[in-house]
């Protein structure tokens, strides 16, 4: 078979020699069908073991190409390699299929390639076909939460539907090229999470998976040993959220017989630098060593960030979740594989661990471009302020933009040039205490820079007494200017304990030399400064903004530049005119501690939030509503939707309540901050009762969406919040249902099971058209599809699922769509049954009842909707008093 008939197969490897050799030995068995392309991130084993091993395979024509990166840049290495392949040799006319996989996997089934290609041929709407994982070595004993890595799939006959990690993923080449274009256009990298989002949300395609072939995960074997340094490393707690956009130079090795790229790499890619021979010497200097390596190219694209993490390959495991749904957020893993199983790994692990990066990489292996300037723009702060146009506030760092949102945007940069980010919407006073505590935590850390960026009018009500804690700690003399409704930022050097600059202008650029010795400030506009040296006669304290204000006299300032040179003493009040003419006056004598209302935080893993979004949004606005004239009784709410919730900085305060969706990480149980959990699993299942007992035993209040679950659990501390009538949501759904032409008789939405399949097949046998929305349909796509149907049916998944699903049904019942539901365990407690909004019947009568409903007139029971709406609203506010 010629090379053009073979399938290119990208294999990402890193550091673990035994695992790499097992994986490549497996792949080489199929070298007659695969053009194997190795993508290696540099490690301590590269020069002495891995590189010679791979070069030998190339010389024996067992490996097609070998991308060797100068350092560990995680999955970005696979991203760069695929981009290069698309530009140079990955022609879909010559190579209709392509594989991408992690290098720690093997497959026993010898027909795995044929099975995957057959699935792609049978399913034209398939985005990719991954390989099913073998869970026989799942490390449950050492990592009990690994049960959450098990993925559920929908059986489609010859194949499964459900997401995988980078587990022998087979693509149609045009599909992969289009996906890479999307990633590049949006500044994204080849990561599981981005691809999961792209295939479903952007392309509305399905992710398929093998049924017969199973992949064995070699890295899981490492976890079987609890004393293994890597296992210990895995089980640590990490407190940093990483934004990885690191890039690096690479060398491309390929055999003479198949090297067709010598003229394909652009000058911009090569940076006009001299060709580096395999022995590391420039071709301008003759080498005395024989050249026994294949031809290669050096693409020394400059890296904007140093290697800050030891991990790179995307893997198939799922994040530690107590429910069986995938965490699609990819996280990097120190065995060289970017692994959704591993979350938030730090870069400062001990050097005696197997994933440590070497410090002795050969300097002449990868050269800096000859024309690289000595100085390089590395950081730009954009603070748009109020009414300053449409440009987005945020931080440009290492050619990556990190957008801010309204309020205080707190960025920190570590010594390894990784970014952390936190936002506080300070349009009111309630967040200031939390904001101050957060900023103060970085003062004695190993972070290098602290950037505080203000966006829009977030600082109008800031309390100076609170901010003084930060002002005094960081010696920020002009902090009281944050009272101005305007743009503002400051950059603080945490190592040198000094302010680099603060400015009320729009832009700032920080420039430094290539070796990062120091920072020099460049500003595009004139800096606004104040030299507050006046001493308040009452306190004799310098550099405290509250020392400059009193109530005897006022000075109006309509422009920030008017503050320059202004001397303030103890006899004057500063009165700052905001741009909407709302005056802001403050004085030391008048400042009071703000009354912080209760702030509710909805906390959920981003990967599962779509299950809870409709329910949470039905009542979150009510948390923000003012039901009392007493400020102490008012509340606010915000959402923390992230796959990093296990490392979030939770505030231990009576004014902060964190409401978790479905699960709370075990290590948070003993934390003293206020916490609750929304539990939506069916308590007619014994295992779910065991799960909920964990929260009860730790005295964590449980919020139920189902009154039936409330009765089953029978715990006096439980809280019932029924699905609320959300006027905005119901208006959209009602318009959809009433105005969408009907293409189907019945809509079914949910995971498929034999019990459900029987009902659906029986409905079809009666000549009715059924729309099956099975897994992966969420949001507007789901709603627009359901609106094409006349009736929605609710069938329990199995015999032990006996609780009515209000999150699926109630919103459509409010929108006047007829609902037919199977009886549930305590359905006599349901208001939708009491007032006839939903039709209930036994399982065996569902088909008959659906036919009767379709034949009958669809009478809009608006009076019942109104009664239920107000009843639930009243119940919610009664519940809120006890939260």
UniProtKB/Swiss-Prot annotation:
Amino acid composition bias (Low complexity), ranges on this chain: 259-268, 277-317, 324-333, 348-368
Feature: compositional bias, Polar residues: 334-347
Listed InterPro entries: Nucleotide-diphossugar_trans (IPR029044)
Location of region: Disordered: 258-373
Recorded superkingdom: Viruses
Record-stated family: Belongs to the mimivirus L137 family.
Protein name per UniProt: Uncharacterized protein L138
The organism of origin for this protein: Acanthamoeba polyphaga mimivirus
